[in-house]
């Protein structure tokens, strides 16, 4: 889990647009966040395996 202070800091409107960055909405992780789902890779994987993300299936070929 991310520090509460860092999550609060990120939610404030930034003075410059360049300073904004994505965070996982579930755990607050700042790295490897999928923009489309607003989830980090770890949370995405957990929810995908449980079938809680509509339209996502395990790949097989």
Curated annotation (Swiss-Prot):
The keyword Cell cycle does not apply. GO terms for biological process: translation. It comes from Staphylococcus saprophyticus subsp. saprophyticus (strain ATCC 15305 / DSM 20229 / NCIMB 8711 / NCTC 7292 / S-41). Signal peptide: none annotated. It comes from the Bacteria. GO terms for molecular function: rRNA binding; structural constituent of ribosome; zinc ion binding. Binds 16S rRNA, required for the assembly of 30S particles and may also be responsible for determining the conformation of the 16S rRNA at the A site. Zn(2+) binds at residues 24, 27, 40, 43. This is Small ribosomal subunit protein uS14B. Its cofactor is Zn(2+). Gene3D superfamilies: 30s Ribosomal Protein S14, Chain N. Belongs to the universal ribosomal protein uS14 family. Zinc-binding uS14 subfamily. Binds 1 zinc ion per subunit. Part of the 30S ribosomal subunit. Contacts proteins S3 and S10. Pfam families: Ribosomal_S14. Keywords: Metal-binding, Ribonucleoprotein, Ribosomal protein, RNA-binding, rRNA-binding, Zinc. One of its GO terms (cellular component) is small ribosomal subunit. PANTHER family: 30S RIBOSOMAL PROTEIN S14, SMALL RIBOSOMAL SUBUNIT PROTEIN US14B.
């Amino acid at each position: 889990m991310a520090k509460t202070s860092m999550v609060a800091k990120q939610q404030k409107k930034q003075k410059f647009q360049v300073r904004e960055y994505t965070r996982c909405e579930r755990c607050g992780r700042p790295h490897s966040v999928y923009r489309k789902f607003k989830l980090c890779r770890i949370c995405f994987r957990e929810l995908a395996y449980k079938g809680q993300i509509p339209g996502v299936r395990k790949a097989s070929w």
